[in-house]
Amino acid sequence: EKVAAAGFHAVEFWGWKDKDITKIRETCEKTGVSVRAFSGMEKYSLCDRDHTEDMVEWIKRSIQTAKMLKCNTLILFPNHFTPSGCADFRDKYSHDAMVANVTHTLTRIAPILEENNITALLEPLCNTGADAGMSVTSTALGADIVRAVASPNVKLLCDLFHMQIMHGNLLNNIMSNIDIVPYIHIADVPDRHEPGTGEINFDFLLPAIQESGFEGTICFEYFPEGDTEAGFPAAKRLFDL
């Protein structure tokens, strides 16, 4: 309700298992706010071949949840997360093997997504600190995987926070893959707070993306520096650039 009052028309959330899906659906119907995407992850990793079958079954369940919410987008990470950081499989697989596993699992999932008109977004993440074992960390590698899967229902999510930490060159990386990027996450670096609190020049970046003809979703995924609602104007301002 607060999101609707602030002038936003869609939301995203992380995992669905601990959520009251019926209440979310009812609130969306009441406010006119839609669920644009949510995480389709649980305790399984795309990069571990031993998780493939479990991941396929979990995606089927996530798709049913998505349909309840009239949502057509799931977000997938290369590695799942534990309380202490991302699951680390470096002792089990080489990096090339992990990348092959991600490609394999997404290829298995793709026909299920296509049958249900659901899109899965692969999100490369940074491998700093407790997440040192993250297997897909760059836009270029994520794009290579998505192109190898070659499904209209498997695309790439560009998270500007992770991109800036891992390699920068944000605009060129997005533009060179714009055909497979329907979704962008926004947060500033270094602390993942709202736009304007760090080093990313959103006043340059967002107009350039919009001028390219981008028609996808731009989602604010940040930890507020202060009060959540107080941060809404800083986010809303970017839509007026």
Language model feature labels by segment:
Residues 1-5, 70-72, 136-158, 162-241:
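Histidine-acidic metal/acid-base catalytic patches
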Residues 9-10, 34, 72, 119, ...:
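Residue-level detector of anion-binding/catalytic polar loops
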Residues 12, 37, 75, 121, ...:
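Conserved beta-strand positions in the central sheet of alpha/beta enzyme cores
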Residues 32-41:
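Short, structured active-site "lid" loops
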Residues 16-29:
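Active-site-adjacent beta->alpha loops and helix N-cap segments on the catalytic face
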